[in-house]
C-alpha cells in the first residue's frame, strides 16, 4: 500500500461544525487562529479503514509580542465516515490537548 497523507492543495477549509469551540480555546490560550482542513481519503490509501474523510489541523504557538509565531507545536489528524464526524473528532482532540498543555505548563510556572 502507498503511504498517504493529506496534502494542502487538496484540503477544503471549514469553520462550521464545532470549530468555533476550537477558535475560542486558541484565542483564550494564545495560539494562532486555527485553520481546520478536510479532504476525502482515497480508496487505495492505507488509512481508508479509519474512515472516508480526514480532518487535519496544525497548531501554532504565538509569542507575547503578538507579531511573531513560535512555530508548529503539534498536528492533529482525525478520520471518520462523514466530514462532520471527522471535524468534530478533531476539534475534541485539539481542545483536549490545548487544555491539558495549559494545565501542565502551569505546574511549572
Swiss-Prot record:
Give the source's domain of life in one word.
Viruses
**Listed Pfam families:** Corona_NS12-7 (PF04753)
Question: Known InterPro entries for this protein?
Answer: Corona_NS2
Q: Mutating residue 43 to I leads to what result?
A: In strain: Isolate BCQ.7373
Q: Belongs to which family?
A: Belongs to the coronaviruses ns12.7 protein family.
Q: What is this protein called?
A: Non-structural protein of 12.7 kDa
Species name: Bovine coronavirus (strain Quebec) (BCoV)
Amino acid at each position: 500500500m502507498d503511504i498517504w497523507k493529506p496534502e494542502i492543495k487538496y484540503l477544503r477549509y471549514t469553520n462550521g461544525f464545532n470549530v468555533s469551540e476550537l477558535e475560542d480555546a486558541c484565542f483564550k490560550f494564545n495560539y494562532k487562529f486555527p485553520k481546520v482542513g478536510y479532504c476525502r481519503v482515497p480508496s487505495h490509501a492505507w488509512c481508508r479503514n479509519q474512515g472516508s474523510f480526514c480532518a487535519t489541523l496544525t497548531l501554532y504557538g504565538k509569542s507575547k509580542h503578538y507579531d511573531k509565531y513560535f512555530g508548529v507545536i503539534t498536528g492533529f489528524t482525525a478520520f471518520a465516515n462523514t466530514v462532520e464526524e471527522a471535524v468534530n473528532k478533531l476539534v475534541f482532540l485539539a481542545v483536549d490537548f490545548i487544555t491539558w498543555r495549559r494545565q501542565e505548563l502551569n505546574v511549572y510556572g
